[in-house]
C-alpha cells in the first residue's frame, strides 16, 4: 500500500500537539475588528485545542 499523503490545506490550518491533540487558530480575527473589544481581540490571538471529537478524528485522518 502506498504512503498516505498529507492534506496540505489542513496542514496549513492545524498542528498536532505532543500528546496528539489538534491545535487550531480562532476565527473572527481577520477583519471588521473595530467593534471588537481589545480583550476579545487579545483572546482571539491565542490558539486553542479542538473540543469536538468527531471533527478531531476527521482532521487526524488528513494529517498522517
From Swiss-Prot:
PANTHER family: 54S RIBOSOMAL PROTEIN BL35M, LARGE RIBOSOMAL SUBUNIT PROTEIN BL35M. Residues 1-45 have a biased composition (Basic residues). One of its GO terms (biological process) is translation. Transmembrane segments: none annotated. This is Large ribosomal subunit protein bL35. Residues 1-64 are annotated as: Disordered. Keywords: Ribonucleoprotein, Ribosomal protein. GO terms for cellular component: large ribosomal subunit. It comes from Natranaerobius thermophilus (strain ATCC BAA-1301 / DSM 18059 / JW/NM-WN-LF). Belongs to the bacterial ribosomal protein bL35 family.
